[in-house]
Curated annotation (Swiss-Prot):
It comes from Mycobacterium sp. (strain KMS). Its cofactor is Mg(2+). Belongs to the thiamine-phosphate synthase family. This is Thiamine-phosphate synthase. GO terms for molecular function: magnesium ion binding; thiamine-phosphate diphosphorylase activity.
Length: 226
């Protein structure tokens, strides 16, 4: 396992609430939203605009627009001591000075991504079955995500392995940080915690909330109480 460089390693180890958000182009409130969610206790914030309402209305987020949105998130993350993550794009992560690059199963090979972003940023991996989990535990990624726990509109057509995979990963007792992901909200969180997860990734549980700060705070309180 790669030893993360300080101060990112300790920040990741202590993180429990990871938020993926789109650029909120149809609302125009990214700065206000990010500040509220981070004030509520979000530890990592990732920009992921694929399949968003903004993409459907305005088209795919171009690199210049993505970097502008990431600068907004970076400023908010710095104010709140949180980590900034970029999805898929190692070049964008490098240009944005992101703390974290998150890779899916079909993204750049890990060694290539590492050469692009350099030694300091953290790299995470998505996993959807036992074999992918085993690979993520063995390879030099800094954390991995497990799921989806439930089907989710942000990943249409993807079969959800459910909480069974979460239980399996929890039974491994790996020291590498991992997050349960997929359809998790405040109502479902107790089931996820009962399955053995202690870190989660959420989307709509905060992005669709009337009060993002309060929604994040309730999730964080439930996580730290275990």
């Amino acid at each position: 396992m790669r030893e993360p460089l300080d101060p990112l390693g300790p920040a990741l180890a202590q993180a429990s609430l990871y938020l993926c958000t789109d650029a909120r182009r149809e609302r125009g409130d990214l700065a206000e939203f990010a500040d509220a969610a981070l004030a509520g206790g979000v530890d990592l914030i990732q920009l992921r605009d694929k399949g968003s309402a903004g993409e459907r209305r305005f088209g795919p987020l171009e690199a210049r627009e993505e970097l502008a949105a990431l600068e907004i998130l970076a400023e908010a993350a710095r104010r709140h001591g949180a980590l900034l993550a970029v999805n898929d794009r190692a070049d964008i992560a490098l240009a944005a000075g992101a703390d974290v690059l998150h890779l899916g199963q079909d993204d750049l090979p890990l060694p290539v991504a590492r050469r692009i972003i350099g030694p300091s940023p953290l790299i995470g991996r998505s996993t959807h079955d036992s074999a992918q989990v085993a690979a993520a535990v063995a390879e030099e990624v800094d954390y991995f995500c497990v799921g989806p726990c439930w089907p989710t509109p942000t990943k249409p057509g993807r079969e959800a392995p459910g909480l069974g995979l979460v239980r399996e990963v929890a039974s491994r007792a790996t020291e590498k940080p991992w997050f349960a992901i997929g359809g998790i909200d405040e109502a479902r969180l107790p089931e996820v915690l009962d399955a053995g997860a202690r870190r989660i990734v959420v989307v709509r549980a905060i992005t669709a909330a009337d009060d993002p700060k309060a929604a994040a705070r309730r999730l964080k309180d439930a996580l730290v109480s275990r």
